[in-house]
Amino acid sequence: MLTFFRLVQYCDVQHRNIPRLRRQVPEPLLEIHPATAAAGRIQNGEWVILETATGRIRLKARYKDALHPGVVATAHGWWQGCQELGLPGYDPFGPEGANANLLVSNDVIDPISGSVPHRSQRCRVRKEGVSA
């Protein structure tokens, strides 16, 4: 199950181009329980592919013991590069990017708020380079 979180270093999708902030969280992350990662032979710090029925993105795995083993979590907003640190931007619309919005369908929308389900997406995680 996929859920989303916000990074306190950034304001929604902004400021990833600021070196002082980018040094703290330099790459898009997938937080994953170590046992879940071990089942997929995913090492801490490796690039992974996160897929839902709607799309896929590329993220760096970061172990987090506090997560339930059946849950992974990521933050949205990765597209800006940070030229001063030599860190790339990410294609906001392609499968090699890190745009978490690509993982969420607009088919189910809350009738009152218009919000999409950012807290409950079925997903699959695999090590980059391993066939689906």
Question: What kind of feature is each model-predicted range?
Answer:
Residues 15-132:
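Long, contiguous, secondary-structure-rich segments that constitute the structural scaffold
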